[in-house]
């Protein structure tokens, strides 16, 4: 049994790009789908697809993105911030900038998951899920 499914999702992505794997599979949940959707919209992954296995189990297939000239991953670091044992919250004035704006922070707010830039613009704080750069 997995105690932290978000950390499992981020670890699968990290292991995938460290091993230069093109497509990884992640068990489906709504919050994982929203994290993957944000990564896709920000250009960190090439594509994702939700597939049904055996008519009851859902998987998210994620195609990782690599630099076409150097072959290195677009994602340099993916780091879980708020953990089940230690939650990290911030209001909109204290939302951290990741690498001076080059990376993103995914924040869970009352309006759903969003990036740090959108949360600052909407003046909403929340729980810092992870940093990606």
UniProtKB/Swiss-Prot annotation:
First and last residue of the signal peptide: none
Keyword set includes tRNA-binding: no
GO MF terms held by the record: rRNA binding; structural constituent of ribosome
InterPro entries registered for this protein in UniProt: Ribosomal_uS8, Ribosomal_uS8_CS, Ribosomal_uS8_sf
One of the record's GO cellular component terms: ribonucleoprotein complex
Aminoacyl-tRNA synthetase listed as a keyword: no
GO BP terms: translation
Pfam families associated with the record: Ribosomal_S8
PROSITE patterns recorded: RIBOSOMAL_S8 (PS00053)
Disulfide bonds: none
Gene3D superfamilies referenced in this protein's UniProt entry, alphabetically: 3.30.1370.30, 3.30.1490.10
SUPFAM superfamilies given in the database record: Ribosomal protein S8
Alphabetical keyword list: Ribonucleoprotein, Ribosomal protein, RNA-binding, rRNA-binding
Purpose: One of the primary rRNA binding proteins, it binds directly to 16S rRNA central domain where it helps coordinate assembly of the platform of the 30S subunit.
Family affiliation: Belongs to the universal ribosomal protein uS8 family.
Subunit field text: Part of the 30S ribosomal subunit. Contacts proteins S5 and S12.
UniProt-recorded name of the protein: Small ribosomal subunit protein uS8
Species annotation: Karelsulcia muelleri (strain GWSS) (Sulcia muelleri)
Lineage: Bacteria, Pseudomonadati, Bacteroidota, Flavobacteriia, Flavobacteriales
């Amino acid at each position: 049994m997995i105690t932290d499914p978000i950390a499992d999702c981020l670890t699968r992505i990290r292991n995938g790009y460290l091993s230069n794997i093109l497509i990884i599979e992640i068990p489906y949940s709504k919050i994982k789908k929203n994290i993957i959707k944000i990564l896709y919209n920000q250009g960190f992954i090439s594509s994702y697809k939700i597939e049904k296995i055996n008519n009851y189990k859902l998987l998210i297939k994620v195609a990782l993105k690599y630099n076409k000239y150097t072959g290195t991953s677009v994602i340099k670091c993916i780091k879980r911030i708020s953990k089940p044992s230690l939650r990290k919250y911030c209001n909109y004035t204290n939302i951290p900038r990741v690498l001076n704006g080059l990376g993103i922070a995914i924040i869970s707010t009352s309006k759903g998951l969003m990036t740090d830039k959108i949360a600052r613009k909407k003046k909403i704080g929340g729980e810092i899920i992870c940093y990606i750069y």
